[in-house]
């Protein structure tokens, strides 16, 4: 059966109340996203390191799903009135019912990162048996290799990582960079994330790839420094975590930063140049990667 999907742009004062009201009046689901995601104005998502425990985007979009025959317009009007909103504008579209598992799988083919590095979902055969194949399925934790920032970090690991080096992947998400580091020759690799679900996903993905990776919440990360520190997170946490990431990098060790937009690279470079001699930024599809060596 088809579904109705409704999108409403609102501010942070009413986003959660509106989503709750829509659910109370019959929406099948209601999600809140950053209205500026993917732009220079995007904000750190819930739970980014250093941010308040309770946080929502200043400009959000509420995305609600309704059944085919639900009176979506009436429900939206009722929910808007309860939230003190008048003349609430929204957009709508029809989503056809499909085999969502099969459709999702069809959208994720193997991804070639370099001459020797592939990311391959479990339902696909490895394109090249002799290549380095990362077995990774799309899931709830960020990081499947399809995003430019992930590819930028993977390319750095593929070309710059030395055999036997230790690697810290801060903000590891699915664990893709931690796992890739081990498959590319790292002697020891640790993934850290503030999300317990990401830590679990990292452990599961490491097991699927037959590598001995360790994953921790930030408070559980053992003391020590690393040859390579990778942080593929957003610009705001990168601003706040600079001193800590530098302290975790050995003298002469290297840092790799991504998750920032091209136009944010100069500012972030100015911050990290306090501790690192930085290489020229690399960019892909409007996203940037910074790397450098600790003095």
From Swiss-Prot:
It is found in: Cytoplasm. GO terms for cellular component: cytosol. It catalyses: L-lysyl-[protein] + 3 S-adenosyl-L-methionine = N(6),N(6),N(6)-trimethyl-L-lysyl-[protein] + 3 S-adenosyl-L-homocysteine + 3 H(+). The keyword S-adenosyl-L-methionine applies. GO terms for molecular function: protein-lysine N-methyltransferase activity. Keywords: Cytoplasm, Methyltransferase, S-adenosyl-L-methionine, Transferase. S-adenosyl-L-methionine binds at residues 150, 171, 193, 232. Its EC number is 2.1.1.-. GO terms for biological process: methylation. It comes from the Bacteria. The keyword 4Fe-4S does not apply. Methylates ribosomal protein L11. PANTHER family: ELECTRON TRANSFER FLAVOPROTEIN BETA SUBUNIT LYSINE METHYLTRANSFERASE. Belongs to the methyltransferase superfamily. PrmA family. This is Ribosomal protein L11 methyltransferase. It comes from Neisseria meningitidis serogroup A / serotype 4A (strain DSM 15465 / Z2491). The lineage of its organism: Bacteria, Pseudomonadati, Pseudomonadota, Betaproteobacteria, Neisseriales. The gene is prmA.
């Amino acid at each position: 059966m088809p579904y109705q999907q409704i999108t409403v742009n609102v501010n942070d004062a009413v986003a959660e109340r509106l989503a709750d009201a829509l659910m109370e009046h019959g929406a099948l689901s209601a999600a809140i996203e950053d209205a500026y995601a993917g732009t220079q104005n995007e904000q750190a998502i819930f739970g980014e390191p250093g941010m308040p425990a309770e946080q929502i985007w200043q400009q959000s979009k509420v995305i609600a799903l309704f059944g085919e025959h639900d009176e979506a317009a009436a429900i939206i009007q009722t929910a808007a009135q309860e939230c003190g909103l008048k003349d609430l504008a929204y957009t709508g579209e029809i989503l056809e019912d499909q085999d969502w598992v099969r459709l999702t799988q069809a959208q994720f083919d193997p991804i070639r990162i370099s001459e020797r590095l592939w990311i391959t979902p479990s339902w696909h055969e490895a394109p090249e048996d002799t290549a380095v194949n990362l077995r990774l399925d799309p899931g709830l934790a960020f990081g499947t290799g399809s995003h430019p920032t992930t590819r930028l970090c993977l390319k750095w690991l593929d070309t710059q990582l030395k055999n036997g080096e230790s690697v810290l992947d801060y903000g590891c998400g699915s664990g893709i960079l931690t796992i890739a580091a081990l498959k590319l020759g790292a002697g020891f690799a640790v993934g850290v994330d503030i999300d317990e679900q990401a830590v679990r996903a990292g452990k599961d993905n490491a097991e699927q790839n037959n590598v001995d990776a360790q994953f921790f919440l930030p408070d559980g990360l053992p003391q020590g420094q690393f040859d390579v520190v990778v942080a593929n997170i957003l610009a705001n946490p990168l601003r706040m975590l600079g001193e800590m990431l530098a302290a975790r990098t050995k003298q002469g060790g290297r840092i790799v930063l991504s998750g920032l937009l091209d136009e944010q690279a100069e500012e972030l470079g100015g911050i990290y140049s306090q501790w690192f001699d930085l290489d020229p930024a690399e960019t892909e599809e409007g996203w940037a990667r910074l790397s450098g060596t600790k003095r």
